[in-house]
From Swiss-Prot:
Its EC number is 1.4.99.-. GO terms for molecular function: D-amino-acid dehydrogenase activity. The lineage of its organism: Bacteria, Pseudomonadati, Pseudomonadota, Gammaproteobacteria, Lysobacterales. GO terms for cellular component: cytoplasm; plasma membrane. Keywords: FAD, Flavoprotein, Oxidoreductase. Pathway: Amino-acid degradation; D-alanine degradation; NH(3) and pyruvate from D-alanine: step 1/1. This is D-amino acid dehydrogenase. It is an enzyme of class 1 (oxidoreductase). It comes from Xanthomonas euvesicatoria pv. vesicatoria (strain 85-10) (Xanthomonas campestris pv. vesicatoria). One of its GO terms (biological process) is D-alanine catabolic process. It catalyses: a D-alpha-amino acid + A + H2O = a 2-oxocarboxylate + AH2 + NH4(+). NCBIfam families: PRK00711.1. Oxidative deamination of D-amino acids. Belongs to the DadA oxidoreductase family.
Length: 429
């Protein structure tokens, strides 16, 4: 089976790896000169198998109004003229109920938990190195209100058997001794011992090398322009002005996936959620994090690589703008100075931004479509690195006609389509 994968971020490359391992003839196409040069380039670096939550949560609508007036707000909305932004925000607000939050979080935890097992198996099989650590995540709560609000998340963790531990303020430094050098006061913390860390770009590029050795063809620097369809199937992809065909197609273009689907009449509610990061050289390892620390107040993660600290987070709903906002840099610097002062050289930090492909309910879109030979692997939001291996393996099983190892409920695009709508799109094709 010939498979054409569109996109060479961590999602596209893991898809290519698992499909090649299943015996498919795989080609990956991307506009960039190498793998992982867009959203996968400098994300926060945490593999948050336990810390998996949708942005659409109870209380967020009220908080969003308050955040409009805060300098260091974790979420900001900058209106554009794109009507899709308004539609996406409307759908997100409808998912901010306790009932929807529980459903969405359970789906996300299901995929994240599976992805951890897939990544661990991949590491054991290939020996791939990506400055990874398996030392867990410490989620910091600055207020008792934040700690109390974590009860619902803890219920889901218990439901899925995800190990966790609640820490008192005095216990936090046992896992992150560098925090003792900061002046921040904490009400407590949630410890997720099975979470991991690692450089997503390094992982993706090294897995691309392994995939190439396994027979995958990577074609970089090529513009993916349009999908064509006929008879209920995709009939080809226009790449650099030339139509190319395959037996099956995988769309893994992150935030740009939705635009490409418009020519098929398929409206995918994936919208860019802009995030920022700083990559900071370590100057004092004793004052740096040992793994991943999550600051619940600012929704910022601080992650340890070998000799660097990656500080990442925030979410701007601002369309496809990739400009660097200096106020966001100030927020990242404020948090790292508050928690780990003196650990890194901020003057030498690399400031970066990327567009995470977010769905309004937080769950990715992985699986089949109304077009028989088109599959999607996108919409992972802030958790693409976390869910990449599980999504890739899950998709490969679906495309090979094998029964996936996890429940498929609610993971594909059909959750957004009524049966009548899906049938009409098939017939129109």
């Amino acid at each position: 089976m010939r498979v054409l994968i569109l996109g060479s971020g961590v999602i596209g490359v893991t898809s290519a790896w698992y499909l090649a391992q299943a015996g498919c003839e795989v080609t990956v196409v991307d506009r960039q000169p190498a793998a992982a040069l867009e959203t996968s380039y400098a994300n926060a670096g945490q593999l948050s198998f336990g810390y998996t939550s949708p942005w659409a949560a109870p209380g967020v609508p009220g908080k969003a109004v308050k955040w409009l007036f805060e300098q260091h707000a974790p979420l900001s909305i900058r209106p554009t003229r794109d009507l899709r932004q308004l539609a996406w925000l409307s759908q997100m607000l409808r998912n901010c109920t306790a009932e929807r939050y529980a459903v969405n979080k359970a789906r996300m935890v299901r995929m994240s938990d599976y992805s951890r097992d897939c990544l661990n198996a991949l590491r054991a099989e290939t020996g791939i190195e990506f400055e990874g650590r398996q030392l867990g995540t410490t989620q910091l709560f600055r207020t008792q209100q934040q700690l109390d609000a974590a009860a619902q998340d803890i219920e889901v963790l218990a439901q899925y058997g995800v190990p966790y531990e609640l820490l008192s303020p005095a216990q936090i430094a046992q896992f992150e001794p560098g925090l003792a050098g900061g002046g921040a006061q904490m009400a407590g913390a949630l410890r997720l011992p099975e979470d991991q860390t690692g450089d997503c770009r390094l992982f993706t590029q090294r897995l691309a090398e392994l995939a190439a050795q396994a027979g995958v063809t990577f074609r970089y620097g090529q513009q993916i322009e349009r999908l064509e369809h006929a008879g209920g199937q995709v009939s080809g992809v226009q790449i650099d002005g030339r139509m190319e065909t395959a037996d099956r197609y995988v769309l893994a273009l992150g935030s740009y996936s939705a635009d490409l689907l418009l020519s098929l009449g398929l409206h995918l509610p994936v919208y860019p959620l802009k995030g920022y990061s700083l990559t900071i050289p370590i100057v004092d390892a004793q004052r740096a994090p040992t793994s991943t620390v999550l600051d619940e107040s600012y929704k910022i993660a601080l992650t340890r690589f070998d000799d660097r600290i990656r500080v990442g987070g925030m979410a701007e709903v601002a369309g496809f703008d990739l400009s660097l906002n200096p106020r966001r840099r100030a927020t990242l610097e404020m948090v790292v100075n508050d928690l780990f002062p003196g650990g890194g050289d901020l003057a030498q930090a690399e400031f970066w931004t990327g567009l995470r492909p977010a769905t309004p309910d937080g769950t990715p879109v992985v699986g089949a479509t109304p077009y028989a030979n088109l599959f999607l692997n996108t919409g992972h939001g802030t958790l693409g690195w976390t869910m990449a291996c599980g999504s890739g393996r899950y998709l490969a099983d679906l495309m090979q006609g094998r029964t996936p190892e996890i429940d498929t409920e609610g993971l594909d695009v059909f959750r957004y389509l009524s049966p009548r709508s899906a049938r009409a799109q098939r017939e129109a094709a």
